[in-house]
Amino acid sequence: ADRLWQGTALETLVYHELRVYNEVSRKHRALSYYRTPAGVEVDFIIEAAGRRSESPPRVVAIEVKRAERWDRAWDKPMRGLAETKGIKVERMIGVYCGPRSYQFDNIKILPLAEFVKALFAGEIY
């Protein structure tokens, strides 16, 4: 139960940082999550740019995990979203508690502190 609580707390912390950045940057982008009827989820979906009615929404997908090592299985929901018609996933980012950042294909994996630094530098959206 402690691990579940810690995971929820970490997601809440990331949500808070996204909300603060959204406000101080005056971007005011929509923040949401993605869930399929089968229960597959992506923690955060952020509008990457203002939506034009003739084009599909462009988004950034973020998955947050309370883990010291990134498991490639956690990429699957973001990849599934990227394959969905009618939406354009511009960036996929994994946030975790490990020590290093790396890239798997088109998914960037960042330690929490690096993610927050990149967020406030305007590098996430």
Specify the residue positions occupied by each region the protein language model found.
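A cross-kingdom feature that marks ATP-driven nucleic-acid transaction machinery
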Residues: 1-125
